[in-house]
Amino acid sequence: LEHAWSRALNAEGGVKTPDILPGKNGSTIQSATSEALGQKRYLAMFEFVEGSEPDQQDDLTGGFEELGEIAAKTHVHSIDWDRPEPFERLVWDLDTVFGQDATWGHWRDGPNIGTQTRQVLEQVETTVIERLTQYGRKPDRFGLIHADMRLANLLITDGETRLIDFDDCGLGW
């Protein structure tokens, strides 16, 4: 799905993304087994895109404005886009982000979280949960999202910006 959406955004949504290169068999997803890993892994290859992420030492105002524009375009596109079947992606809801079995683990287990930081983040978590619960999960509010859209996932070259790293895309706010 992430490949289909990335291509559709590039073709229809006004968001530049790297092209996905098919293997010899024509599929954009390949599999390989390594003795070192002991199990099958799935692979994808993307075109190499020149560029660099916005420099955090610079004024990032323009970068965040562009990030907001790209986020808006992906949101608008995802509302009307016909998702391919079968559709299986991560769901980024309150349970998978804040719950006991959160997809990426619990923020409380992160490094260097002292008492003061923990207290602030607990207040933030409570507020986010309350607001998202009130906001609801109607289709125009909870749908397909990139889920890792940050300046580090923008590649800029010659005034053109590309959005990369769709592997976490799923359903969320």
Where are these regions (language model features)?
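Conserved catalytic motifs of the protein kinase core domain
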Residues: R41, D140-F142, G159
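Mechanochemical coupling/switch segment within NTP-driven translocation systems
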Residues: Q116-Y135
